[in-house]
């Protein structure tokens, strides 16, 4: 029963409240901060549970009053109150079930977004730029900050590849569903016959990880330095400031030339490498899960075609949940929250189904 689990969580919350008020624990700041975070994670569940208990109590009181009431107007008022409380009871049950779902430990983290042009040549590179702009505009709407880690541009303004960081609370929880193949259908500017071309762009969203989560030994990396280049390979720096890091055990390679400082480029490249190694380990773990238990929504398979952007129809279709929106211009301007909310809801529904019995 979920009620038993909720009672246990409430007791745990109360125990933590006592502990964080203990002067002896407060002296150990690391332990105190850990307990405060643990309590904060439980607070929203406890508050919902307390409201749920109050609603149940109020319902019972109003029903008892109704059975003893003879005045017609009072009966109408009580019936309205009972109806309102019953609706809130159902809402809270759904909210609590979602709150009790296992939390992705990466949800609160910053992210690295990697966008690469796929099939389609110049058109794919141009659409890679469109997606980069879409995500940065969305980040602005969320009051998040962005920072380019590495960039490989084309002569016509497209991106062969761009890796950038988005810093903000809950960034991974909202953007993790964007990993996969994005397909675009449109008429290129150079197409005189008006024929629609199909191109693809690959997006990968990686949570930022720290040194403790992924340790990289010095002996496992080879660091090469070279001069940064701009459009068409032209040199834009007279010093060897660009950095290429090769992780020897895995073969992963990360380059960064965005900064003028070699040290800063190395720091950025190491951050990206650490996140790629983390994702690789997570993917290997996920591959070990039986196929029938894998998520339908998906948050990590780069080869999965997840979405189509059709310019002639002004349409965006997400193939995982079958949702189609007809607002392509505003979507590409960063108004993607409706799609993200739908993906989160679908993911939550699937997880609740896997949990089985969710009766209160």
Swiss-Prot record:
N5-methylglutamine PTM positions: 234
UniProt-listed PROSITE patterns: RF_PROK_I (PS00745)
Gene Ontology CC annotations of this record: cytoplasm
Compartments, record wording: Cytoplasm
Keywords assigned by UniProt, alphabetized: Cytoplasm, Methylation, Protein biosynthesis
GO molecular function: translation release factor activity, codon specific
Highest taxon in the source lineage: Bacteria
InterPro entries: PCRF (IPR005139), Pep_chain_release_fac_I (IPR000352), Pep_chain_release_fac_I_sf (IPR045853), Prokaryotic/Mito_RF (IPR050057), RF-1 (IPR004373)
Changes after translation: Methylated by PrmC. Methylation increases the termination efficiency of RF1.
Protein family (similarity comment): Belongs to the prokaryotic/mitochondrial release factor family.
Function: Peptide chain release factor 1 directs the termination of translation in response to the peptide chain termination codons UAG and UAA.
PANTHER family, sorted: LD18447P
Protein name (database record): Peptide chain release factor 1
Organism per entry: Clostridium botulinum (strain Alaska E43 / Type E3)
Gene, per the UniProt record: prfA
């Amino acid at each position: 029963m979920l009620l038993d689990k909720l009672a246990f969580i409430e007791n745990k919350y109360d125990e933590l409240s006592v502990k964080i008020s203990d002067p002896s624990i407060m002296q150990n700041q690391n332990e105190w901060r850990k307990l405060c975070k643990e309590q904060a994670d439980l607070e929203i569940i406890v508050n919902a549970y307390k409201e749920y208990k109050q609603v149940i109590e109020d319902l019972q009181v109003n029903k008892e009053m109704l059975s003893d009431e003879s005045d017609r107007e009072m009966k109408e008022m009580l019936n309205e109150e009972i109806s309102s409380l019953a609706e809130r009871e159902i809402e809270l049950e759904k909210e609590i079930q979602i709150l009790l779902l296992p939390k992705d430990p990466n949800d609160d983290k910053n992210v690295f977004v990697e966008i690469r042009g796929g099939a389609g040549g110049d058109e794919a590179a141009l659409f890679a730029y469109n997606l980069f702009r879409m995500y940065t505009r969305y980040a602005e709407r969320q009051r998040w900050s962005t920072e380019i880690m590495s960039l490989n541009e084309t002569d016509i303004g497209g991106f062969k590849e761009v890796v950038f960081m988005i810093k903000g609370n809950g960034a991974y929880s909202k953007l993790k569903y964007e990993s996969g193949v994005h397909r675009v259908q449109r008429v290129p500017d150079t197409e005189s016959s008006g024929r629609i071309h199909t191109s693809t762009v690959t997006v990968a969203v990686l949570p930022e990880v720290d040194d403790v989560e992924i340790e990289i030994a010095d002996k496992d990396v080879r660091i090469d330095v070279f001069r940064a280049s701009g459009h068409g390979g032209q040199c834009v720096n007279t010093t060897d400031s660009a950095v290429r890091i090769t992780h020897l055990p895995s073969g992963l390679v990360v380059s960064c030339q965005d900064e003028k400082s070699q040290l800063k480029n190395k720091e950025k490249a190491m951050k990206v490498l650490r996140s790629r190694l983390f994702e690789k380990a997570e993917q290997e773990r996920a591959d070990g899960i039986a196929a029938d238990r894998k998520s339908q929504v998906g948050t990590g398979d780069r080869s999965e075609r997840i979405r189509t952007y059709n310019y002639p129809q002004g349409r965006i279709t997400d193939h995982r949940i079958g949702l189609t929106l007809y607002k392509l211009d505003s979507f590409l301007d960063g108004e993607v929250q409706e799609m993200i909310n739908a993906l989160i809801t679908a993911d939550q529904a699937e997880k609740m189904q896997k949990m089985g019995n969710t009766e209160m």
